[in-house]
């Protein structure tokens, strides 16, 4: 079963949940999760917790424990917060390049689902009649301790956007599209740029490249073994290392080049 994860303490999450139930024919099941009724449609479940999702390590195990169902994939429907309050529709995988400041474990990564994130990006871009920014975010926050592929799809970045009905509809439709469609793309690990990964976003929207984990400039430098770990945490094989050259530190550029040669991966310099 495929799982859409929501939380009661997140207004964007509840907005998206409401639109999923209203617009896509989800019905109450006889299951509960964390004391909340589970909704279902075909092979998709909507689960709701009462906690912050970013701190929910081992969620896949908890879902199996409470529902007796092993999830194939988890899509987190969430808010995105930023001081700049940029109206945005974003997607990313979770994990920590260094210290775990907001959930997860240090230097640990969830399993990326590159094709799903790319499909989410393309669908949000197509549906975006709000004029908001549509983008990847770099890999950040928890949960990192999950053994099934997962991704966050978010409404940002302030309460005004979180409760916007149209944004809720766009994300609900995007989630359903991602869970129903299967498409394969060439996969790259992304290195460089700011938190909103502008170059990686542009490349994903305009070419056949999909990204797994994205290492932003602010998280550099990182150790070789951390990049190797990120490379291994993808449900689809990573074939390339993509570097936003100006948006990366010198030592990280060099390390990326060396790793690509060592592992026989394509090196893409942008």
Swiss-Prot record:
The keyword Hydrolase applies. Its cofactor is Zn(2+). One of its GO terms (biological process) is D-amino acid catabolic process. Keywords: Hydrolase, Metal-binding, Zinc. Gene3D superfamilies: AF0625-like. One of its GO terms (molecular function) is D-aminoacyl-tRNA deacylase activity. Its EC number is 3.1.1.96. Pfam families: tRNA_deacylase (PF04414). The keyword Methyltransferase does not apply. PANTHER family: D-AMINOACYL-TRNA DEACYLASE. Belongs to the DtdA deacylase family. NCBIfam families: PRK03995.1-4, PRK03995.1-6. This is D-aminoacyl-tRNA deacylase.
